[in-house]
Amino acid sequence: MHTQRKGIMLDTGHYMNTTTQLKTPEDAVAYLNKMIDKYEKAQMLHWFKGMHLQLSLGGDYVRKQRKEWREHPIDFDKIPFYELFRLAYDHACHIDLHQPFIGEGVREFVERVAPKYITLEYQQNSREEYEQFVETQSKILKWITIR
C-alpha cells in the first residue's frame, strides 16, 4: 500500500492458533517473540499500530478434533444449515478462546511491540466475568503507557 496511513493490527490469539503446540502462556510469549524477531530484523516493528491482546491455547482441542474427524468423518451435507452454523460457531469458540493473556513476559512483549492501541476482547459469561478479566489483564499490563 502506498499510503502513510497503514499499519498492522496484531491479534495475539489468532497468531497463537497458527500452531497446536502451545501449552502455556509462556510458550505463547516465546512463539510471539520469535515472530516479532523477524519484523524487528526487517526494521518493520514500527508498522504494528495495534494489538488485540488475548490468550488462545486451543491446540489440544484442535488435535483431538482432527483425530475424531479422521476416525468418524461428518457428512456436512446431511446437517441442517442452522445446526451446522451452531456447530461451526461452537467449534470456533473452542479454538479461539479469547482469554486474558497473563503470564511471565506478557507485559514485556507488549512493551516490545509498543502498539498505539490495545484491544481487550474476551469470551465471557457475564458482565462481572468480563470486568474480572479486564481487571486481571490490567494488573499484568500495569496500565503501561506506550508511545
Can you describe what each PLM-predicted range is?
Residues 3-12, 16-147:
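Histidine-acidic metal/acid-base catalytic patches
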